[in-house]
Amino acid sequence: MLSDQDHLTPAHRRILLLAWAGWLFDFYDLILYSFLLTEISRELHLAREEHSLVLGFSLGMTAGGGVLFGVLADRFGRRPILQITILTYSLGTVMCGFSTSLGSLLFWRGVTGLGVGGEWGSGHTLIAETFPPRRRGHFGALMQSGAPLGVGLAAVMGTLFTPAYGWRATFIVSGLPALLVAAFRKGIPESDLWELRRREAGGGQRLGAPLAALFRGGIRGTAFKALVLAVLNMSAYWFTYVWFPGYLQEERGMTVARSGIWILVIVAGELVGYATFGTVSDWIGRKSAFTLYAVLMSCGLALLTLFWDVIAPSRGLLLSAMGLVGIGTGTWSNFGPFFSELFPTSLRNSAVGAALNLARGVQFFTPLVITWV
């Protein structure tokens, strides 16, 4: 079995590359729309409220995608569903470039969200079931590092490519991830654990069985705790990247440019967090590592809000506090390996995909809650 290997094989590398690139373009496709709002508004005559509807709908569809493709992956296998999710969000993104109305744009952004929601769970589950357990955290974190790179790529395409070629061309060329599936279609093995479970069960299980199992017995409590953990952690993440720039500008008097520079410090810390979390969690355990990095993020946010007047005179303290916030977001590297280890093979993909993407769907309300508080 692949997970019993003492060293990485070419098959491991192909799995990691496809899952990492799939997650990079997953985040890229989800964020890209935000950089194209002005161009789209000008041509399709959309109001701000209509853009909010499109953004909220696509985010909500990620929850549906996480549940749907999670169930399908538990029934039909990790490999084909991972490939289908990448094809789904690639198709949705390309077709956005041909949208002529709010209705068509809403539909294709929904398709994009559906594929985006399914990719994360399938990719992490395939890695968890094929990589050596003692290095599972490290390689799960490596896959997660695609997220900030996806955001950066979306920013580059939105600010450099779009002014020259237009928003439609940006959407169309963003369908290139589909080529990943074509390139790696035959080189990606199926999960040994999934195939073993399928043989022991005498064939495929009933399609809705994994989802139904999440609401029974001890699994129900574990699934609920996983969902709550994901919701709280994701709320802290969106707090940092959605509310915090405005806080620096409106409450602390920073210019847009200066606040942007400080946010880049957080992003740099985020890359450090992703790079280190996996190894730390393999060393001291998933829960201990999560607690450590969550405390770092909490301390950083407390310094930047409750104790701003104390640290503001010192550039070094500001730099350190923002770096702590960024490093603390390394907790995201924990969810794939940790959740994969909490659930049995028969319903692993359903549980992992549902926990993260239902939490992501709930984030539609987070900006409203933050504003109210």
Predicted regions and their residues:
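Extracytoplasmic gate region of multi-pass secondary transporters
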Residues: 34, 219-271, 367
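C-terminal ends and interior cores of transmembrane alpha-helices
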Residues: 87-100, 296-311
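Helix-loop-helix hairpin linking two adjacent transmembrane segments in secondary transporters
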Residues: 143-186
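Conserved MFS/SLC helix-loop-helix module at the cytosolic interface between two early adjacent transmembrane helices
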Residues: 64-102
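Helix-breaking motifs and short loop linkers at transmembrane-helix boundaries and internal kinks
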Residues: 45, 77, 98-104, 132, ...
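Central cavity-lining transmembrane alpha-helices of secondary-active solute carriers
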Residues: 56-69, 264-276
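Extracellular/periplasmic helix-loop-helix junction of adjacent transmembrane segments
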Residues: 34-64
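Cytoplasmic helix-loop-helix junction between adjacent transmembrane helices
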Residues: 108-145
